[in-house]
Amino acid sequence: MAIAYNLGKGEYKNWIISETEFNENNLPKFETIFSLGNGYMGLRAATEEHYFNETRGCYVAGMFDRFKGEVAELPNIPDYVGMEIKLDGERFNLNQGKIISYHRYLNVKDGELVREVEWQSPAGNITKLVFKRFVSLANLHLAGFKIKIIPVNYSGKVAIKTGYNGQVTNSGVQHFVEGDKRVLPDGKSYLTVRTQESGIFTIVAGKFRFLINASEINPQQQIVTGRRQLFLRSEYELKENECLEMEKCVIVYTGRDLEFKDKDIDSGDIVETALTTLDKAGTKRYEELFSEHRQKWHKLWHEIDIEIGGPDFDQLAVRFAQYHLVQMTPSHDSRISVAAKGLSGEGYKGHVFWDTEIFILPFFIYTFPQIARKLLEYRYHTLDGARKKARENGYKGAMYPWESADTGEETTPEFGEVDIKTGKPIRIWCGEIEQHITADVAYAIWHYYQVTGDKEFMYNYGTEIFMETARFWASRLEYNQGLDRYEIKDVIGPDEYSEHVNNNAYTNYMVKWHLEKAIDIYNWLSDDSRDILEKIINKIALKEDELNEWKKKKDKIYLPFQEDSKVIPQFDGFMDQDVIDISSYRGDVGAIMKAYSWDEITSSQVIKQADVVMLLYLLGEDFSHEVKEKNYHYYEPKTLHDSSLSPSIHAIMGKEIGDLDEAYRYFNKSTTIDLGRNMRSCDAGLHSASLGGIWQAVVLGFGGVKVKDNVLNIDPMLPEKWDYLNFKLKWQGMPIRVEIRNDRVSVSFLNDDKAMLKDVSVMVKGRNLQLNNNKAVVNL
């Protein structure tokens, strides 16, 4: 097979994902899973040489542009990776000649992508080539590249053409207009462009270094230009077994970067900043720049690495998930958040969904709470967009968009795929009626506060969001006079195969929770810091009558539940719909649409992803074990898992009901969504939520971590194939290590500074322990 998981050796065992053979058809898969990033920019792993099936991509977080008649998307900035290599007159292309050996691998411990090739050209010339690259954690604006070329059985001329290509597009859409091109006397060069609609200035600058047999040379370079293109071409005479090295240091800046926020700058200032940064970095060799980057990664891994005593693939898969969660997240800037595909591809146009708050955020809450806070601050910075959406739809308060970009306004496209039977494009209703995201944001805020105790966040951001979103729900509820209850009609729940439904259980239960928690927060703040509360009340003009309205309405919200069967109907009428045998459609996303029309699917008990099961996970303390078990077994056979968000939730709930085989089966399913052997699984980018779900399945699922009555609970159950599970987390700001064995659980502080520690109450397997400078051990 083209992918291997076991080629990491020694200290790199279970840290390496390998591509072991070249196949142009597989390029999109590896471009995605081998993508590099640092939260500021993400780089798809397109090869240096060009192929027909490639999708080259470099994306800067928070940078959006809108083409006429379309929604805003993350534009593909000028490509700085591509190059043309000619070896004794023959173009280096792996579709020609013969591949003697090939190995490309991503090292997630170091954050480096390496490709080693031995290639025989059609003329019989054999060349060894090594390509290395990284996107720096030490300098968010920097990417580094190194290439080695060794002619094995010939002497001849080697030519390299590389530079910057601004003709790249987003699936054909060109977002940039021409700027400047410069080649400077000191070896620096750059290309500038500007987005067409949003007007964001962008510079890609670089400096190249060439060596033959480790001695630096200054080759004559030919300048090649085109529209939005600047390349430098150079030639070298190499003897047999001589080694040519090229190092490239690239710097990227844009006009929306945090460094320039609220500053009176022009494009010249941005160019100067980029060139100054390049001057400092350009004096360093690849190894030095990479070493600085690698040290940052190793420091991160010291804080977050999870150790699994089980199958090697499980260990690798969790590290793969954590690596990508870190590299795709804009931890430097609270004005932006994590896109559904991270920074690894054009899928979903770089938009932010509920994926961030419900699936990705928990990883950061428990490992890097300062980053989690910034992701939540994004929702505060875009609160005006949510207020605007509420007004435009006739509601009060703040109604978060289903898909969000930089402003917080709704960016969901109106139409999607074509219906196989009608031939008409399917209307996408999510932007109008998939409204549970507003409760999801509130849930994430409360989850963050429970784990961190960050009052300052609640004072300045969280409470205002909670009150404004509670306002929305109070205005959204519809009173059913005949049944004396409040309902929520015409919505989409998490299951997007059921549209225009009434009283989606997930939505209704979450709204009741939302209103209750808003009242609790109001009362808490009234006691804790009345002056802060008064400031918020005055800012948003919150009246006491509104609070009384919330209290009245929350107690009358209809919560679907069948007392006899203990099943929660997913929505009104769901239990009366036809049941389709979906077994033959599982495992092939969208396959059911080739056999049934959209209307047939939406009117049957066919579920795209966890819906009621999702509810049981998030509000688990509100439901008995019996209710969880009966609903899991009712809904699981009806769920296609056509969304990558679904398997990890079923893994967690499988463990919750005590079915470890089921839990482990779904954990395996979640780990193979991106990393598995399906070569078509992630062409458009990574499944960010799924990666967050993998971490949750391990730590919050098998590790049993949850917050109950404001106390950290640890109630683990390990899969049969695991002997141990070790992980670290932060609770109320204190680093804690958890070690789980089949016969015991130990919990200890990681900080040796006793002055920084405080007594912590931890519930382990139902036993209340005091953690105060000592390791607490519970025998099972």
From Swiss-Prot:
Binding site for substrate: W354, D355, K608, Q609
Keywords for this protein: Carbohydrate metabolism, Glycosyltransferase, Transferase
Top EC group: transferase
Entry's Gene Ontology BP terms: carbohydrate metabolic process
InterPro entries xref list: 6-hairpin_glycosidase_sf, 6hp_glycosidase-like_sf, Gal_mutarotase_sf_dom, Glyco_hydro_65_C, Glyco_hydro_65_M, Glyco_hydro_65_N, Glyco_hydro_65_N_sf, Malt_Pase/Glycosyl_Hdrlase
Catalytic activity: kojibiose + phosphate = beta-D-glucose 1-phosphate + D-glucose
EC number per UniProt: 2.4.1.230
Molecular functions per Gene Ontology: carbohydrate binding; hydrolase activity, hydrolyzing O-glycosyl compounds; kojibiose phosphorylase activity
Active site positions, chain numbering: E496 (proton donor)
Family: Belongs to the glycosyl hydrolase 65 family.
Function: Catalyzes the reversible phosphorolysis of kojibiose into beta-D-glucose 1-phosphate (Glc1P) and D-glucose. In the reverse direction, uses Glc1P as acceptor to produce alpha-1,2-glucans up to a degree of polymerization of 6.
PANTHER family associated with the record: GLYCOSYL HYDROLASE-RELATED, PROTEIN-GLUCOSYLGALACTOSYLHYDROXYLYSINE GLUCOSIDASE
Protein name, per record: Kojibiose phosphorylase
Lineage per the UniProt record: Bacteria, Bacillati, Bacillota, Clostridia, Halanaerobiales
